[in-house]
């Protein structure tokens, strides 16, 4: 976990790859989250809705990105986490998570950093999720 003295604006951890995301991963996440929309597990349903195949629940990637961020800066230190869903993740995709410190400051007696986060699809380079978070840093 990165500490206050190690971090500067522009600091970034090593990118991390996750996957390939399998249909089993997708169904497991659906079971854990209670989101059973058939577009994420029923091939015929997804195709009838105009998609080439089933695709991952966006919150799966949001969880992967959150795990990346908390591995970097500590789960107990999260003060804010927000994401925007940009692009579907398909079975077999590998996603790559990255982050950058955008602001380092003191507020309310605590050291804090704001970070931009990104989860991209390795195959296309497209952003699956863009995120932002605030962490307290000891």
What is the meaning of each model-derived region?
Residues 1-15, 88-138:
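HotDog/MaoC-like acyl-thioester-processing domains
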Residues 1-77:
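Hot-dog-fold acyl-thioester-processing enzymes
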Residues 39-44, 79-81, 108-109, 121-126:
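Glycine-rich loops and low-complexity Gly/Arg-rich segments
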Residues 71-97:
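Mid-chain, well-packed structural core segment of small domains
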């Amino acid at each position: 976990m990165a500490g206050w003295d190690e971090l500067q604006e522009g600091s970034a951890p090593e990118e991390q790859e996750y996957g390939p995301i399998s249909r089993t991963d997708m169904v497991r996440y659906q079971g854990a989250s209670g989101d059973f929309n058939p577009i994420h597990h029923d091939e015929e349903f997804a195709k009838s809705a105009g998609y080439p195949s089933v695709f991952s629940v966006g919150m799966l990637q949001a969880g992967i990105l959150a795990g990346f961020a908390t591995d970097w800066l500590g789960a107990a230190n999260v003060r804010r986490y927000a994401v925007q869903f940009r692009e579907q993740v398909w079975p077999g995709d590998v996603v790559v998570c990255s982050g950058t410190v955008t602001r380092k400051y003191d507020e309310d007696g605590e050291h804090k950093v704001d970070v931009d986060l990104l989860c991209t699809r390795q195959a296309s380079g497209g952003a699956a999720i863009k995120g932002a978070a605030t962490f307290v840093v000891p």
